[in-house]
Amino acid sequence: MARLAAFDMDGTLLMPEHHLGRETIATLARLRERDITLTFATGRHVLEMRHILGTLSLDAYLITGNGTRIHSLEGDVLHRQDLDPQVADTVMHHAWDTRASMHVFNDNGWFTGQEIPALLQAHVYSGFRYQVIDIKSIPAHQVTKICFCGDHDDLIRLRIQLNEALEERAHLCFSAVDCLEVLPLGCNKGSALAVLSNHLGLSLADCMAFGDAMNDREMLGSVGRGLIMGNAMPQLIAALPHLSVIGHCGNQAVSHFLTHWLDNPHLPYSPE
């Protein structure tokens, strides 16, 4: 039986309206009763995740910023990784040929250059929001990650530009169809989960993980049991064809799967 369960948030544990369903919360509590350690592995900021965690009355480790930070149950930093300052400087100051908006993250919060109210819908239940500033004024040595939000085809063209400019100095991934992230080299949820597992005296074989986007690929591919959401990006399913696909986040599929796993661990699972 798995001893550590890792959950992506948006498109996985959260429902389409970006909140946790009652069945999901109850199932997470059941995992803790079985002494299974929980970790939420997300692109969201730790400041937001602490607020969300505080509403659940659950102990969980936090992997935030797509692996740039790991926090203990007590809120202590177990691991941190920032963008190379030269990479951050290049990304923030270059005039990219794109219509996508740029968003910069550091330990103090989420920063962008203009008001984009539509982006706040994903954070309506936590109240977390961006701060509008001149992005070029942000110190390059304090940046954890940078992301671009916009049309997918536009982001694909932008990824080509970023790859040419940054070469092998950063990790690029799609955390959603409309979000392209620039992360520290070698930084992803999978590498962070390996650090956390080692800290807990576990191996990745002792872990199960759930996800729906390309920023979950390394995590899902490295654990003992990786589960892909039915609403996942097609690229993720294609990249990990050997993994099982469960139901849709709107149907609380993670809870559905885990309830079966807890109650009938030796029987085959069907998402129906």
UniProtKB/Swiss-Prot annotation:
Its cofactor is Mg(2+). Mg(2+) binds at D8, D10, D212. GO terms for molecular function: 4-amino-5-hydroxymethyl-2-methylpyrimidine diphosphatase activity; magnesium ion binding; phosphatase activity. Catalyzes the hydrolysis of 4-amino-2-methyl-5-hydroxymethylpyrimidine pyrophosphate (HMP-PP) to 4-amino-2-methyl-5-hydroxymethylpyrimidine phosphate (HMP-P). It comes from the Bacteria. This is HMP-PP phosphatase. It comes from Salmonella agona (strain SL483). Keywords: Hydrolase, Magnesium, Metal-binding. The keyword Plastid does not apply. Gene3D superfamilies: 3.30.1240.10, HAD superfamily/HAD-like. Belongs to the HAD-like hydrolase superfamily. Cof family. PANTHER family: HMP-PP PHOSPHATASE, PTHR47267. The keyword Magnesium applies. The active site is at D8 (nucleophile). It catalyses: 4-amino-2-methyl-5-(diphosphooxymethyl)pyrimidine + H2O = 4-amino-2-methyl-5-(phosphooxymethyl)pyrimidine + phosphate + H(+). The lineage of its organism: Bacteria, Pseudomonadati, Pseudomonadota, Gammaproteobacteria, Enterobacterales. NCBIfam families: Cof-subfamily (TIGR00099), HAD-SF-IIB (TIGR01484), PRK15126.1 (NF011705). Its EC number is 3.6.1.-. It holds the Pfam family Hydrolase_3.
